[in-house]
From Swiss-Prot:
InterPro entries given in the database record: PSI_PsaJ (IPR002615), PSI_PsaJ_sf (IPR036062)
Primary role: May help in the organization of the PsaE and PsaF subunits.
Protein name from the UniProt record: Photosystem I reaction center subunit IX
Stretches that traverse the bilayer: 7-27
Gene behind the chain: psaJ
Family the UniProt entry places it in: Belongs to the PsaJ family.
UniProt-annotated location(s): Cellular thylakoid membrane
Species annotation: Gloeothece citriformis (strain PCC 7424)
Keywords: Membrane, Photosynthesis, Photosystem I, Thylakoid, Transmembrane, Transmembrane helix
């Protein structure tokens, strides 16, 4: 139980980092392939 507060405080930090990585990847993919978000691939 000693590591539980550290784990709970680490969760929001990891969430923010993961969402930042996902947003950055989505922006980069949208810059390289701008039509993928609006039209199907077929």
């Amino acid at each position: 139980m000693k590591g539980l507060p550290k784990f709970l405080s680490l969760g929001p930090v990891l969430l923010v980092l993961w969402l930042s990585v996902q947003a950055t990847l989505l922006i980069v993919i949208n810059i390289i392939y701008p039509d993928l978000l609006f039209y199907p691939l077929s």
